[in-house]
Design a protein with these regions (language model features):
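Short C-terminal tail/terminal secondary-structure segment
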Residues: 1-4, 151, 230, 241-254
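Conserved glycine-rich cofactor-binding loop
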Residues: 19-21
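Substrate-binding pocket helix/loop in short-chain dehydrogenase/reductase
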Residues: 77, 102-103, 107-115, 210
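Active-site loop-to-helix junction immediately N-terminal to the catalytic Tyr of the SDR YXXXK motif
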Residues: 106, 151-161, 172, 197
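Active-site helix of classical SDR
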Residues: 126, 162, 170
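Alpha-helical segment proximal to the catalytic Tyr-Lys
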Residues: 131, 175-179, 238
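Residue(s) in the substrate-gating loop at a strand-loop-helix junction
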Residues: 146
């Protein structure tokens, strides 16, 4: 039956940035589909753990500050997932930050912080997970891109650079790892009602201009990403490699 292809029973997923918002929603979605969940964040993942446990799935919190994490730290996180939960089948690289300033005034510190979390840590976590997935002959990696993987944006040069990089690395890794049984794809969320967009939503003029361009007529929510995440994490997407799927209420069609 086709619906069985979307089940994740017996699978284990590692989700970064799972404390709240999109990451919490993604972790919950995979648990609802049957997966055990490891949540990597700086802390405070008890609420996410409660949602996972409510689905009668196992939950493993992993404390890690991606602003400072080295490739060795990320390799250790993957090894802990395998040691404590038995395997790693799915990685969702959701953790990310944004800094806003005009390009002429943008600081090196803000540039480096964004690039380290959004791009460098993402790549080396892909690498660490793929080493394990290649050995077992299968795996699903889902990177969280952005509309700014396709567009330039305003006042967010490092974020745009990092998310353009996420899309590029997703395609590059798909080229290398498809033959190893690893699917690497990405989801590009639109304007979501999360902490990253709080400043935009608090600006009445900017918020109205954004909503006027979205055919769906509303801000997105973590619930809107669940279907795409489960699809990409499941065997239903076995022939999909290197895709960057917009979930944006139609923003990119305008």
């Amino acid at each position: 039956m086709i619906l069985d292809a979307f089940r994740l029973d017996g699978k284990t997923a590692l989700v970064t940035g799972a404390r709240q918002g999109l990451g919490q929603g993604l972790a919950s979605a995979l648990a609802e589909a049957g997966a055990d969940i490891a949540a990597l964040d700086i802390g405070g993942v008890a609420e996410t753990g409660g949602a996972v446990n409510a689905c009668r799935r196992r939950f493993l919190p992993i404390a890690c500050d991606l602003r400072k994490a080295s490739p060795a730290d990320l390799q250790a996180a993957v090894e802990r997932v395998v040691s404590e939960l038995g395997r790693l089948d799915i990685l969702i690289n959701n953790a990310g930050i944004i800094r806003r300033a005009p390009a002429l005034e943008f600081s090196e510190t803000d540039w480096d912080d964004v690039m380290h979390i959004n791009l460098k840590a993402m790549f080396f976590l892909c690498q660490a997970a793929a080493r394990n997935m290649a050995a077992q002959g299968s795996g699903k990696i889902i990177n969280i891109a952005s509309m700014l993987s396709f567009q330039g944006g305003i006042l967010v040069p490092s974020y745009t650079a990092s998310k353009s990089g996420v899309a590029g690395i997703t395609r590059a890794l798909a080229n290398e790892w498809a033959s190893k049984g690893i699917n690497v794809n990405a989801i590009a969320p639109g304007y979501m009602a999360t902490d990253n967009t709080a400043a935009l939503r608090a600006d009445p003029r900017r918020s109205v201009s954004i909503l006027e361009r979205i055919p769906a007529g509303r801000w997105g929510s973590p619930e809107d990403l669940k279907g795409a995440a489960v699809f990409l994490a499941s065997s239903a997407s076995d022939y999909l490699h290197g895709a960057v799927i917009p979930v944006d209420g139609g923003w990119l069609t305008r």
